[in-house]
C-alpha cells in the first residue's frame, strides 16, 4: 500500500469526517484520479517532439500515455483535424498515490522560486488544477537528455462537493498552498 494511501485512511479521513461532520464515512471526499496533460504545439511540424513528450510522460507517471488529437482544423495554427497535439495519462489507485507523494515531496520543492501552489485553481466542483512550467523538476527526467523544456497540467479529480472540502483533502496530503 502506498504511503499516502495509508496516511489518508488513518489520518486524513477521520480528520475530514470530524471537520465537516459527516454521519457516514463514505461521505468523506477522496481522490478519484490524477490526469497529467502535456500539450506539444510543435508536434504539428515535427513528429519527433511528440515522441519525446510521450517518453518523458511515461517516465514521470510510470504508465504509458495516450496521444491527444486536434478536434478541429485551425488554419492560423497550421493545424489539421486528427493531428497529434499532445499527450495525457490518467492515474488511479496505487500509482496515483505514489505520483502524488513524489509531486508533493520531491518535484514541487525543486521548482525555482517556489512559495506554494495557488489556492484559487479549484473549479467549483471539488477538482483542482495545477500547472508546471518545466518537466525537469521530476527526478526521473535526465536534464542532459531533455530536448525542450515543456510544461504540463496536473488535474486532481476528487469526490468532494465543494472547493473547501477539496482544499481540506489536499491539505491533508500536505499540499503546500499559498496563504
From Swiss-Prot:
Disulfide bond residue pairs: none
GO biological process: translation
Keywords noted in UniProt: Ribonucleoprotein, Ribosomal protein, RNA-binding, rRNA-binding, tRNA-binding
Pfam families on file: Ribosomal_L5 (PF00281), Ribosomal_L5_C (PF00673)
Tagged with keyword Ribonucleoprotein: yes
InterPro entries: Ribosomal_uL5, Ribosomal_uL5_bac-type, Ribosomal_uL5_C, Ribosomal_uL5_CS, Ribosomal_uL5_dom_sf, Ribosomal_uL5_N
A GO CC annotation given for this chain: ribosome
GO molecular function, one term: tRNA binding
Family recorded in the similarity comment: Belongs to the universal ribosomal protein uL5 family.
Described function: This is one of the proteins that bind and probably mediate the attachment of the 5S RNA into the large ribosomal subunit, where it forms part of the central protuberance. In the 70S ribosome it contacts protein S13 of the 30S subunit (bridge B1b), connecting the 2 subunits; this bridge is implicated in subunit movement. Contacts the P site tRNA; the 5S rRNA and some of its associated proteins might help stabilize positioning of ribosome-bound tRNAs.
Record text on subunit structure and interactions: Part of the 50S ribosomal subunit; part of the 5S rRNA/L5/L18/L25 subcomplex. Contacts the 5S rRNA and the P site tRNA. Forms a bridge to the 30S subunit in the 70S ribosome.
Protein name stated in the entry: Large ribosomal subunit protein uL5
Amino acid at each position: 500500500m502506498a504511503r499516502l494511501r495509508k496516511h489518508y485512511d488513518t489520518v486524513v479521513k477521520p480528520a475530514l469526517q470530524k471537520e465537516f461532520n459527516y454521519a457516514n464515512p463514505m461521505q468523506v471526499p477522496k481522490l478519484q484520479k490524477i490526469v497529467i496533460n502535456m500539450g506539444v504545439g510543435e508536434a504539428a511540424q515535427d513528429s519527433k517532439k511528440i515522441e519525446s513528450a510521450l517518453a518523458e510522460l511515461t517516465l514521470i507517471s510510470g504508465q504509458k500515455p495516450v496521444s491527444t488529437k486536434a478536434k478541429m482544423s485551425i488554419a492560423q495554427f497550421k493545424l489539421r483535424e486528427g493531428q497529434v497535439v499532445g499527450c495525457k495519462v490518467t492515474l488511479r489507485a496505487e500509482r496515483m498515490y505514489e505520483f502524488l507523494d513524489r509531486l508533493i515531496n520531491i518535484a514541487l520543492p525543486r521548482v525555482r522560486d517556489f512559495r506554494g501552489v495557488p489556492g484559487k485553481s479549484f473549479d467549483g466542483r471539488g477538482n483542482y488544477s495545477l500547472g508546471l512550467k518545466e518537466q525537469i523538476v521530476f527526478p526521473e527526467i535526465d536534464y542532459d537528455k531533455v530536448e525542450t523544456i515543456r510544461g504540463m497540467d496536473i488535474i486532481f479529480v476528487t469526490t468532494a462537493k465543494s472547493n473547501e472540502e477539496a482544499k481540506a483533502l489536499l491539505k491533508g496530503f500536505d499540499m503546500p498552498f499559498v496563504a
